[in-house]
Amino acid sequence: MSQRLRTTRLALARDFASQSRLRLLSDGERLPWGRRETFESDPARDFGGLQQQQPAFVLCPADIEQAQAALRFLYDAAIPFSLRGAAHSPAGEVLSDGGAVLDLRGLSSLLPTASPDAVRVQGGCHWLSLCLPLAPRGRAPRVLTDNPHTTVAGTLSVGGFGDSSHRFGLQVDCVRAATLLLPTGQRCEVTSDDPLLRYALAGRGQLGILAEVSLPLWRRGWALHARVLHFADVTSFVAASIHLAETQRVDCLRARAHAVPPHAVSAVVGTYGAELDPALLRDLPYAAISEPEWLDFLAHAQQAGPPGWAPYNPALEVVLPLPSGLGLLSELDALAHALGPERLPRGYSLQVLRGRGASLLPLVPLPDSPWALIVALRPECQTLDEAQQVQARLQALLPRVAAVGACVYLASFPVPASLVEAQLGPERATLGELKRRVDPKGLCNRGALFGYVLA
């Protein structure tokens, strides 16, 4: 990107920002959100840390009208732009080299609804900020990720899975309606049967900004009565998880694989607001079980604050078909053991949920099998050289991902076009058609689809 073009774009943006009273950042200024000296406030970095791209400028709209004005300006000026929330992305999806970054965390309001069992929330709101006012009312989102310090629109743009996905599927499956801002600035009110919303959910920002969404709420308290089940191997964990998912009587199922003998997987299993019935766990193939205790993940998240990550975090998160993907899981597990606890201090996440047939959405990153297993490897590295070496080892597994019919959920590196096309399947044509309709100049979130550019 030439310095002359950067300078021209910045001059145009300063004029626009001055006239519209919209906050503009440039020349390495930090974002007004997040912890200092971390990727959270650095517009040139994201969670992955393996890429650094300096935008010509950043626009920080404070409401939907400002976001629309920013989009119209960017589109009229033909300036490519990336949409940024909490930047919990590993491959530079929220970065821009010489273009613009649109930071959406100013769109963070909770809006009134007629029903106590629904919520309307703006896309830049953190999940934690959504949950805190719901808790005293005995309400919760149906699915919540294990890191609530991410934005609503950010997780909905990729899918979003959590410890109740065995009951309700992905977070995108819960969206009932939305306000979508198209890349041109046009505002669209869409419902769950509208193709624009159906392809915006898990669409990685290709169709614009999820400015507001309507979500059904779960009537439950936040006190979780739980036990920790330890499994000698992943096969036993998968069998137990499928049984618990089929019974639909356990509210929470949160698991991590680790390298602490003699247990391969440990899973928190529990129910909200009532004691966990021991009969629900009878005959499950666990190797050991803890005494029951009461937990409050919301209070813990509020007290602990955002996770402390290493400077560099290469990542590969895949969704495996069951049982055919268990061979690849063995390879992923072998790599995790080789990387060791210094790079995977928390182990890695596992989640069993139903496959693609359980979702009505076209872009959900789920295989066609009845059951699927999400495996999330996010090694922590202290140097860029170390991270690049680890990333190369993760990247080497992509041919196996394709061979078993698995889906990539997140990756810190570009995914081969053939694998992206296979994952999108026939839905690629419809997504491409919608993209050309709402973003004819191809300015919004270029490359955010695993590095793939829709033709």
Q: What are these model-predicted stretches?
A:
Residues 1-23:
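Intrinsically disordered, low-structural-confidence terminal and linker regions
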Residues 66-79, 132-146, 186-201, 391-395, ...:
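Short, hydrophobic/aliphatic alpha-helical segments
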Residues 5, 12-13, 96-98, 283-455:
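Conserved glycine-rich FAD pyrophosphate-binding loop
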Residues 17, 74, 83, 134, ...:
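A generic structural signal for well-ordered alpha-helical segments
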Residues 157, 176-327, 334:
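C-terminal substrate-binding/cap subdomain adjacent to the FAD-binding core in PCMH-type
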Residues 22-31, 38-146, 159:
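Glycine-rich N-terminal segment of FAD-binding domains in flavoprotein oxidoreductases
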Residues 59-60, 90-111, 164-184, 209-216, ...:
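Structural signature of FAD isoalloxazine-binding scaffolds in flavoprotein oxidoreductases
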